[in-house]
């Protein structure tokens, strides 16, 4: 159902590129429309059993880092802590990338427009790939930690509160992994942790 309006947007951006070949904003618009197509494709996989294939975790984290780094305020520093050797995990790369991106976007929101640091950390631990997304944002109240993965739970003024609920479904049901709030302190920040079998 999303395909038709997205195809329309793609056609319009092609026309704009031809009409205004020197405009710097049109290639960015084109990237965002292509990204919208990718997201629509990802969501069409929800409900059906997605195909899992051996994929480079380092490459996925690089994609998320590059995407977030280009679209995040300069007052927020995004850092990567990766193992020297590549970790290969059996996943659906586009869905899993969406999960990490969603955690990173939540981390940006947690800063509330202030300066801070987001860290994307990957390591191998006891036959598992461990991914942690940490921020120095506002933190989650203790009473709310148990609810963050519940559909509809949100502390934001806009949005439906479905991101973390969907992230848990993708990690735990489709990838047989684990996702949790590793730690959170009000005024100091939050760390989300994902574990996947290698």
Describe each model-derived feature in a short phrase.
Residues 117-127:
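Short beta-strand/loop element within the Bergerat-fold HATPase_c
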Residues 77-88:
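Conserved catalytic submotifs in the C-terminal HATPase_c
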Residues 8, 23-75:
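Conserved DHp (HisKA) dimerization/phosphotransfer helix of two-component histidine kinases, i.e.
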Residues 135:
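Acidic ATP/Mg2+-coordinating residue in the GHKL
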């Amino acid at each position: 159902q999303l395909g038709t309006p997205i195809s329309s947007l793609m056609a319009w951006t092609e026309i704009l590129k031809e009409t205004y070949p020197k405009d710097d904003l049109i290639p960015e618009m084109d990237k965002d429309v292509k990204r919208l197509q990718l997201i629509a494709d990802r969501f069409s996989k929800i409900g059906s059993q997605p195909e899992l294939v051996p994929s480079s975790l380092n490459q996925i984290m690089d994609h998320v880092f590059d995407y977030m780094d280009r679209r995040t305020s300069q007052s927020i520093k995004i850092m990567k802590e990766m193992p020297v050797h590549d970790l290969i995990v059996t996943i659906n790369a586009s869905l899993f990338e969406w999960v990490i991106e969603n955690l990173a976007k939540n981390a940006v929101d947690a800063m509330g427009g202030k300066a801070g640091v987001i860290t994307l950390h990957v390591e191998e631990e006891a036959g598992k790939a461990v991914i942690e997304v940490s921020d120095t944002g506002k933190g989650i109240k203790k009473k709310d930690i148990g609810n963050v993965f519940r559909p509809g739970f949100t502390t934001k003024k806009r949005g439906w509160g479905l991101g973390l609920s969907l992230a848990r479904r993708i990690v735990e049901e489709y990838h047989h992994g684990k996702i949790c709030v590793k730690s959170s302190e009000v005024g100091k920040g939050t760390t989300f942790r994902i574990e996947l079998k290698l």
